[in-house]
Amino acid sequence: MSAQFHMDPETYLDAIRAEISRYDELQDATIDAIPFAPRGVLELGVGTGETTRRLLERHPDAEVTGLDSQPEMVFHAREHGIAVRLARMQDPLPDGPWDLVISVLSVHHLDADGKRDLFRRVREQSRAFVMGDVVAADPQVTPLEEGVDLPSAAEDMAEWCGGEIVWRADDLAVIRAVYD
């Protein structure tokens, strides 16, 4: 995915929709995959807060804490009332336990070892994990930036997190793992 829009919260949604034509389907499928009404939610890569907004529409009693590594996105999300911390997915996760850890279009930035490590830490601190992301596919529909976008096969990620693929379209997938 092109880096030019990653830092600008004002243009991010339009740009991501231009690059990923099924972006809204991915978001909807991710929210649909939530296995229960969560209370404590950790979102990895909160960005503009779009996933949090959609989650709260469906689960208004949820309390969401977000993480993002981009200061511009953290500032934007905070301006819109989202509790978000400046942190990378490689950093220790905020203390759980969490009912749900959720992520949309963030995990593909980690290499395979980074993904396995993240999934191990998520499993230790949560009841469930739902992820919607770009996955390795042939053909690769989503434009990728070399060295930045590192998609893995959906089947591998499902195995690594102890989950299952619950939705797939082109080179996008939603994976859900329930741990309790």
Where do the PLM segments sit?
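Conserved alpha-helix/loop element of class I SAM-dependent methyltransferases that forms part
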Residues: 21-37
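C-terminal lobe and adjacent flexible extensions of AdoMet/dcAdoMet transferase-like proteins
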Residues: 175-180
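Class I SAM-dependent methyltransferase Rossmann-like catalytic core
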Residues: 6-24
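A conserved beta-strand element that flanks and buttresses the S-adenosyl-L-methionine
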Residues: 102
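Class I SAM-dependent methyltransferase SAM/SAH-binding core
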Residues: 44, 48-91
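A short, conserved alpha-helix within the catalytic core of class I
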Residues: 110-121
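Hydrophobic adenine-recognition pocket in adenosine-nucleotide-binding enzymes
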Residues: 106
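C-terminal alpha-helical "lid/dimerization" subdomain adjacent to the S-adenosyl-L-methionine
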Residues: 130-174
